Amino acid sequence: MKLETKCHGIIEYKEEDVIEFKKGIPGFNELKRFINFPIEDNEVFSVLHSIENNEIGFIVTSPFSIIKDYEINLDDSVIERLNIENEKDVLVLNTVTLHSKLENITVNLCAPIVINIKTKLGEQIILNNGKYQIKHPLFKEGI
C-alpha cells in the first residue's frame, strides 16, 4: 500500500505495519491507524504518521537516546489494553516539537507513546510522576 504524505513523499507500507490506537492520540482522537517509518539518513528520529489523514504525522524519538535511565511504569490497565505479555515487545516513543532554532527543539517526556510491536496496538499515556518535562530540550544551547 502507499501513503502520500504532505512532508515525506510517498511511503510504501504493508497492512501488518499499521499500528492501531483504539483511543486515538490526544488531540487527534478520531485518528486510529498509524505507521512508524524512519527519516532518511537519520537513526534518531522517525515519523509516526496517520494513514487516515495524510497531513498528520509526528516526529518521534526514543526517550532512551535522550535520557539513558528513562523509565515508565505501565498501569495494569494499559498492559491489558495493549495485550503486553513481554516487555521486549514494547516500543516507547516520544513526540518532538521542531523549531527553527536548534536550542528550542523539545521532546515531550511526560507523554510517551507505548506500542506493542507484536500486536501492533498503541496508546499515548500521561506520566504524573513529576520526573520528566513536557518540553525537555533536545539540544543544549551552543551545540
UniProtKB/Swiss-Prot annotation:
GO terms for cellular component: cytoplasm. Gene3D superfamilies: BH3618-like. One of its GO terms (biological process) is bacterial-type flagellum assembly. Keywords: Bacterial flagellum biogenesis, Chaperone, Cytoplasm, Translation regulation. InterPro entries: Flagellar_assembly_factor_FliW (IPR003775), Flagellar_assmbl_FliW_dom_sf (IPR024046). It is found in: Cytoplasm. NCBIfam families: PRK13285.1-1 (NF009793). Acts as an anti-CsrA protein, binds CsrA and prevents it from repressing translation of its target genes, one of which is flagellin. Binds to flagellin and participates in the assembly of the flagellum. PANTHER family: FLAGELLAR ASSEMBLY FACTOR FLIW (PTHR39190:SF1). Interacts with translational regulator CsrA and flagellin(s). Belongs to the FliW family. This is Flagellar assembly factor FliW. The lineage of its organism: Bacteria, Bacillati, Bacillota, Clostridia, Eubacteriales.
